[in-house]
């Protein structure tokens, strides 16, 4: 373990303006981005991530079209951020090194390079170029619940070897419990250098986002992802104001104003939600089935279109071990379920 929350300062990475895009179908207006980014910056978070929900260049028929371009969102945030590090996310194959360079030119100084948990090797070029640009770089191993701890650690080792300053346990499905988080971070400790930071990206589908983040910090994760009011895919991410309040009670140094975060969550974020970000029968099914949280809104749309229960689709997606990037298969699964019902 390389970090101790009892003695060190946590690095609070807000994801409201990236993962939170999924919750409102990538429809943040630029004025909302300014308002949210300023509130987060004023409240003392260390970093603010901004992009389409699926990362740079994510706007598409497959993932959903954004209300604005990544550049318009990033520029809006950059206009008001004075202290926090402006961050973005890039999924190789969706975003390219050209998008990365443009983001850097607009003021982005930290990037999370995200791959499926078994595909770290596709991140080599992007991590290397980000390092060449002088950026802070994290490796982001999505759907970390889908392989065991030792296998995940080997993927983390690859990301470290490419130059990542930090490697995350990324619980995209909100399917990990505290033991799963603990096991994965301990496996990281067995293979990663002490100077390589660890991070946790939790989702709240089983209502464990905050608990998993606390356990992660206790196991050496210094970078904690969270979002205002949990704004994010599925049941959302670890709610930022809740995590900070819990960390406060433990006496941990997080550098944030918990009351300001509460106000931002309640006054700014909740009114933007066209669908409540919460644990309900659909979002719980994501964690139960181990399904990519971003599939929620796509599955709800398909269920309505074909007269199905959203849970049926999500459970079947889990059985088929579908992963991020296979959003186009959700309709195929729905049609298969309709055919099976008619048979």
From Swiss-Prot:
Gene Ontology process terms (BP): catabolic process; L-leucine biosynthetic process
Sites where the protein binds Mn(2+): 201, 203
Top-level taxon of the source organism: Bacteria
Signal peptide location: none
A single MF term (Gene Ontology): 2-isopropylmalate synthase activity
The reaction(s) this protein catalyses: (S)-4-hydroxy-2-oxopentanoate = acetaldehyde + pyruvate
Pyruvate carboxyltransferase domain: residues covered: 10-262
One Pfam entry name: DmpG_comm
Keywords from the named record: Aromatic hydrocarbons catabolism, Lyase, Manganese, Metal-binding
Record-annotated active site: 22
Site (Transition state stabilizer): 18
Disulfide bonding pattern of the chain: none
Entry's EC annotation: 4.1.3.39
Enzyme class: lyase
Binding site for substrate: 172, 201, 292
Family (UniProt): Belongs to the 4-hydroxy-2-oxovalerate aldolase family.
HAMAP family in the record: HOA
Protein name listed in UniProt: 4-hydroxy-2-oxovalerate aldolase
Organism: Sphingobium yanoikuyae
């Amino acid at each position: 373990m390389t970090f101790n929350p009892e003695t060190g300062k946590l690095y609070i990475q807000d994801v409201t303006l990236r993962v939170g895009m999924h919750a409102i179908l990538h429809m943040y207006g630029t004025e909302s981005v300014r308002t949210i980014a300023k509130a987060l910056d004023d409240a003392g978070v260390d970093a603010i991530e901004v992009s389409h929900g699926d990362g740079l260049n994510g706007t598409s028929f497959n993932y959903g079209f954004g209300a604005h371009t990544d550049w318009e969102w990033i520029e809006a945030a950059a206009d008001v951020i004075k202290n926090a590090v402006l961050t973005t996310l890039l999924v190789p194959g969706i975003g390219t090194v050209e998008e990365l360079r443009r983001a850097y030119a607009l003021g982005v100084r930290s990037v999370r390079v995200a791959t499926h948990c078994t595909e770290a090797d596709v991140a080599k070029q992007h991590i290397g170029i980000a390092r060449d640009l002088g950026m802070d770089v994290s490796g982001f191993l999505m759907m970390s619940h889908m392989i065991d701890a030792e296998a995940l650690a080997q993927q983390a080792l690859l990301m470290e070897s490419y130059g990542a300053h930090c490697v995350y346990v990324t619980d995209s499905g909100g399917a990990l419990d505290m033991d799963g988080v603990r096991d994965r971070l301990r496996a990281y400790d067995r293979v990663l250098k002490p100077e390589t930071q660890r991070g946790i990206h939790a989702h709240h589908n089983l209502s464990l986002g905050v608990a998993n983040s606390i356990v992660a910090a206790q196991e050496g994760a210094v970078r904690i992802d969270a979002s205002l009011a949990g704004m994010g895919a599925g049941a959302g991410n670890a709610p930022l104001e809740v995590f900070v309040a819990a960390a406060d009670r433990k006496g941990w140094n997080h550098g944030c104003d918990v009351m300001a975060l509460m106000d931002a969550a309640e006054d700014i974020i909740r009114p933007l939600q066209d669908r409540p970000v919460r644990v309900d029968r659909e979002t719980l099914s994501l964690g139960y089935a181990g399904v990519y949280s971003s599939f929620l809104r796509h599955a709800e749309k398909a269920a309505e279109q074909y007269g199905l229960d959203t849970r049926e689709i999500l459970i079947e997606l889990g059985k088929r071990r579908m992963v991020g990037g296979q959003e186009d298969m959700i309709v195929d699964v729905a049609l298969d379920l309709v055919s099976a019902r008619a048979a």
